[in-house]
C-alpha cells in the first residue's frame, strides 16, 4: 500500500529564521490510519501540519529541501485550494475558521466555491450536519455556539469536501471534558464510517489515547525522536524527556515504585490487579501522616449571590463561598454551569443585588470595575481578547505605564514576569508572531506585573505544553505562598488535583461541592452531575479494589505538595 502522506529527509526554514524549524523529517502515514503528532510548544509539529495542508509555502514563506508527497503529489507544486480537496483542516482557534453568518452558510462555503447548484448544496449541507448531530442548529450563528459545537460545525464543513485526510490542530484545546469526549467519539465515528485518514497535532497524550491511535509520532526541537504504537511509546519513558506528560496513572505507578516486570502498562486494564493493590496499600501505610492545616485569613467572602440575565436565564442562585489569602481554588463545572458568570460578578461586569461581596471585610458591591481591578484581576481564556499592544514587552509594560511606575521599575518587573512565563527570549517580538499558547502566557505575564490580591484565571493552562504548564504552575504556587489568592476556572482535572487547595463545583448556577480537590474529584455522583472526567489515577486506584480510594488520592497529592515544599 502506498502512503497517503510521505516525508523523506524533509527540511524547512522560515523566511526570516536563522535555522530550519524542522530537520531531516522522515515518516509515512497510510490511508485510514489515525496518527498523533505530538511535541511541546515550538517543537515543529504545527510546521509539519502547515506543510501538509499547503499553508507552507503559500501563506508562510521559506525554503525547503527533501521530499514531501500528499496523495502522491508534491504539495509545494499545488495551490492551497487544490490541497484542500485532499486535506481538510480544523484550526485550534475555531473562531478564525468561521466565514458564514449561520451554521448552514459556513458549512456550505466549500460547495459555493465549487459552484454546486443550490438544491444539491442544501441537500449536502443538511446531510453533513446530520452526520455530526448539528442539524437542529443550522440557522444559528457559529459564534453563539459552545466550543464543542463549534468544533463539530467545522467538522461538518470538512465532510462536504470529501477530503480523504482530516487534519486537526489541537482539537481539545478549549473544550470541557464532556465536549472533549464527544469530539473524540465523533472523530472515531467519522473514521469508522468513511475510513478517513486522521492526523492530529496535540500535546495532550492521555486524552488522545481514547482515539485508539495506530501510531504516535514524537517531534522535539524540529526532529523526529520516535515513531511507534501507543503501547510502546508509553512503555519507553520518552515522553517526560521531551517535555510531554504521561497519563497520570503511569506517573502514579512510577511514584509508587511499581515494577511491571516488563508487562504492558497500557491500557490500564492490562495491569495485574493484585500487584497494584499490594503496592498501593504498602505505600499508604508508609505515607500516613497528619496533615498540617495552618489557619489563613479570609480574603474574599461571597454571601447569597444570585444573578439572572436579561432573558430571565438564571446564571447564579444563592452562591456562598470564601477564598483565603494564598489559597488556590479550582472552579469546576460543565459549560454553562455558571463559572464565568461568577467570575464576572466578582469583577463587577455583572451587577448583583441583595448580595454581598467582601474583600478583607469591606463590601465592594458599590465599587466600579476599575476600582475592583486594582485588587481582583481576571485573565480571559482567549488571549486575543486581552492583548492591545504590538510587541511583547509593550504589552507586559502597559498596565504599569498607566499607573505611572518608573521606567526602571517597569523594565525590571516586566522582564521578571516574562522570564517566569518563558517569554523573555521573545520580548521584542511582534505579538502576531506568537503562537496561541505563547499569547496565553503573555496575558498572564501582564497581570503578574501589577501585584494583585486575587487573580481569576480562565483555563490558565489551555494551549500550553507540559513543560510550560509545570513552570507556570510552580510560579503560581510561589505567588500563593506570598499571599496572593487564585481562582482557576478550568476543565483540567489533573490541574485541579495537583495544584488546587480546594475545588468548588457549580451546576446550573448552584454550588454542589466544595472540598479538597481529591475528595470532590473522587466522588462519582458529583463528576457525573457536573459532566467532569474521572482522572486515570483514580481509575487505577478503583481498579486495584482498595477500600478507600479517596483517602489514597488525598495522601498522594498531599505527599507531592510536601515534597515541593508547598
Swiss-Prot record:
It is an enzyme of class 7 (translocase). SUPFAM superfamilies: P-loop containing nucleoside triphosphate hydrolases. It is a peripheral membrane protein. One of its GO terms (cellular component) is ATP-binding cassette (ABC) transporter complex. ATP 1 binds at residues 39-46. ATP 2 binds at residues 333-340. Keywords: ATP-binding, Cell membrane, Membrane, Nucleotide-binding, Repeat, Translocase, Transport. Residues 5-246, 300-533 form the ABC transporter domain. It is found in: Cell membrane. SMART domains: AAA. InterPro entries: AAA+_ATPase (IPR003593), ABC_Co_transporter (IPR022216), ABC_transporter-like_ATP-bd (IPR003439), ABC_transporter-like_CS (IPR017871), ABC_transpr_CbiO/EcfA_su (IPR015856), ECF_ABC_transporter_ATP-bd (IPR050095), P-loop_NTPase (IPR027417). Pfam families: ABC_tran, DUF3744. One of its GO terms (molecular function) is ATP hydrolysis activity. Its EC number is 7.-.-.-. Coiled coil: none annotated. Probably part of an ABC transporter complex. Responsible for energy coupling to the transport system. PANTHER family: ABC TRANSPORTER ATP-BINDING PROTEIN BC_2655-RELATED (PTHR43553:SF26), HEAVY METAL TRANSPORTER (PTHR43553). This is Putative ABC transporter ATP-binding protein BT9727_2424.
Amino acid at each position: 500500500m502506498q502512503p497517503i502522506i510521505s516525508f523523506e529527509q524533509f527540511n524547512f526554514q522560515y523566511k526570516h529564521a536563522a535555522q530550519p524549524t524542522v530537520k531531516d523529517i522522515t515518516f509515512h502515514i497510510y490511508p485510514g490510519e489515525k496518527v498523533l503528532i505530538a511535541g511541546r510548544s515550538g517543537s515543529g509539529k504545527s510546521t509539519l501540519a502547515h506543510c501538509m495542508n499547503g499553508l507552507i509555502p503559500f501563506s508562510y514563506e521559506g525554503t525547503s529541501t527533501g521530499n514531501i508527497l500528499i496523495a502522491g503529489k508534491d504539495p509545494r507544486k499545488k495551490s492551497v485550494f487544490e490541497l484542500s480537496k485532499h486535506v481538510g483542516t480544523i484550526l485550534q482557534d475555531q473562531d478564525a475558521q468561521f466565514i458564514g453568518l449561520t451554521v448552514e452558510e459556513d458549512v456550505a462555503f466549500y460547495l459555493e466555491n465549487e459552484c454546486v447548484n443550490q438544491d444539491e448544496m442544501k441537500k449536502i449541507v443538511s446531510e453533513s450536519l446530520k452526520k455530526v448531530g448539528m442539524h437542529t442548529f443550522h440557522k444559528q450563528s457559529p459564534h453563539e455556539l459552545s466550543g464543542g459545537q463549534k468544533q463539530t460545525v467545522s467538522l461538518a464543513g470538512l465532510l462536504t469536501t470529501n477530503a480523504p485526510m482530516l487534519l486537526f490542530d489541537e482539537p481539545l484545546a478549549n473544550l470541557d471534558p464532556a465536549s472533549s469526549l464527544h469530539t473524540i467519539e465523533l472523530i472515531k465515528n467519522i473514521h469508522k464510517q468513511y475510513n478517513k485518514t486522521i492526523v492530529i497535532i496535540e500535546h495532550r497524550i492521555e486524552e488522545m489515547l481514547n482515539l485508539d491511535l495506530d501510531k504516535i509520532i514524537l517531534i522535539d526541537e524540529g526532529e523526529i525522536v520516535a515513531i511507534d504504537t501507543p503501547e510502546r511509546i508509553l512503555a519507553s519513558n520518552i515522553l517526560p524527556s521531551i517535555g510531554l506528560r504521561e497519563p497520570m496513572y503511569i506517573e502514579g505507578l512510577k511514584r509508587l515504585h511499581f515494577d511491571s516486570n516488563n508487562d504492558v502498562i497500557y491500557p490500564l486494564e492490562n495491569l495485574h490487579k493484585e500487584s497494584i493493590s499490594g503496592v498501593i496499600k504498602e505505600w499508604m501505610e508508609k505515607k500516613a501522616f497528619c496533615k498540617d492545616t495552618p489557619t489563613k485569613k479570609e480574603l474574599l467572602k461571597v454571601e447569597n449571590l444570585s444573578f439572572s440575565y436579561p432573558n430571565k436565564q438564571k446564571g447564579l442562585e444563592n452562591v456562598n463561598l470564601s477564598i483565603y489569602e494564598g489559597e488556590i481554588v479550582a472552579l469546576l463545572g460543565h459549560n454553562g454551569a455558571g463559572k464565568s458568570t461568577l467570575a464576572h460578578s466578582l469583577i463587577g461586569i455583572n451587577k448583583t443585588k441583595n448580595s454581598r461581596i467582601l474583600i478583607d471585610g469591606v463590601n465592594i458591591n458599590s465599587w466600579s470595575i476599575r476600582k475592583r481591578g486594582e485588587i481582583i484581576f481576571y485573565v480571559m481564556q482567549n488571549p486575543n481578547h486581552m492583548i492591545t499592544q504590538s510587541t511583547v514587552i509593550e504589552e507586559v509594560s502597559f498596565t504599569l505605564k498607566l499607573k505611572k511606575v518608573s521606567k526602571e521599575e517597569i523594565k525590571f518587573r516586566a522582564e521578571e514576569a516574562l522570564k517566569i512565563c518563558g517569554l523573555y527570549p521573545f520580548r521584542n517580538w511582534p505579538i502576531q508572531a506568537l503562537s496561541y499558547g505563547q499569547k496565553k502566557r503573555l496575558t498572564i505575564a501582564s497581570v503578574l506585573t501589577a501585584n494583585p490580591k486575587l487573580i481569576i484565571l480562565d483555563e490558565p493552562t489551555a494551549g500550553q505544553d507540559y513543560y510550560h504548564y509545570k513552570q507556570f504552575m510552580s510560579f503560581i504556587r510561589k505567588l500563593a505562598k506570598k499571599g496572593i489568592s487564585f481562582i482557576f476556572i478550568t476543565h483540567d482535572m489533573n490541574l485541579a488535583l495537583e495544584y488546587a487547595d480546594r475545588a468548588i463545583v457549580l451546576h446550573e448556577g448552584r454550588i454542589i461541592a466544595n472540598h479538597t480537590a481529591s475528595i470532590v474529584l473522587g466522588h462519582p455522583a458529583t463528576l457525573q452531575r457536573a459532566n467532569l472526567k474521572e482522572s486515570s489515577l483514580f481509575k487505577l486506584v478503583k481498579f486495584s479494589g482498595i477500600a478507600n480510594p479517596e483517602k489514597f488520592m488525598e495522601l498522594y497529592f498531599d505527599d507531592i505538595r510536601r515534597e515541593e515544599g508547598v
